[in-house]
Amino acid sequence: MRVTQGTFSFLPDLTDEQINKQLAYIVSKGFSANVEYTDDPHPRNSYWELWGLPLFDVKDASAVMYEISSCRKAKPNYYIKVNAFDNTRGIESCVLSFIVNRPINEPGFLLQRQDFEGRTMKYSLHSYATEKPEGARY
């Protein structure tokens, strides 16, 4: 099952050339960027691990691409994404986020249903990947 989080998530995976074009857009707008990774793909997991430091005042997209490449080498079977932040209004708001790397096998999710009083149904998602310990999921 393909995880669909962030911009472009319903499109085929971006090539490095397409990623470079998005990074050039980020730099041209003066946005800050960062690279994050995780092996827990749950949609509500908003606490991905930060790779290195946030890239403030970057003038060249190749600096961000270098960080992506470094993260890919160190974490080849993890989800890796780029976030871009705009601070023009005095706050850091995420304006662009997209996945640049995926595990070869994405095991998917289990939908758990529970019956409650009054014919109420409650649902929860469980990622099959999290059945293994962190760092050994893919």
Curated annotation (Swiss-Prot):
Keyword Transferase in annotation: no
GO cellular component: chloroplast
Top-level taxon of origin: Eukaryota
Keyword entries, A-Z: Calvin cycle, Carbon dioxide fixation, Chloroplast, Photorespiration, Photosynthesis, Plastid
Subcellular localization: Plastid, Chloroplast
One function term, GO molecular function aspect: ribulose-bisphosphate carboxylase activity
Alphabetical list of Pfam families matching this protein: RuBisCO_small
Coiled-coil features, chain-numbered ranges: none
Main localization (coarse): plastid
Biological process according to GO: reductive pentose-phosphate cycle
Note: In this alga, in contrast to plants, the small subunit is encoded in the chloroplast.
Function: RuBisCO catalyzes two reactions: the carboxylation of D-ribulose 1,5-bisphosphate, the primary event in carbon dioxide fixation, as well as the oxidative fragmentation of the pentose substrate in the photorespiration process. Both reactions occur simultaneously and in competition at the same active site. Although the small subunit is not catalytic it is essential for maximal activity.
Family per record: Belongs to the RuBisCO small chain family.
Subunit architecture: Heterohexadecamer of 8 large and 8 small subunits.
Protein name in UniProt: Ribulose bisphosphate carboxylase small subunit
Source organism of the structure: Pyropia haitanensis
Gene (name only): rbcS
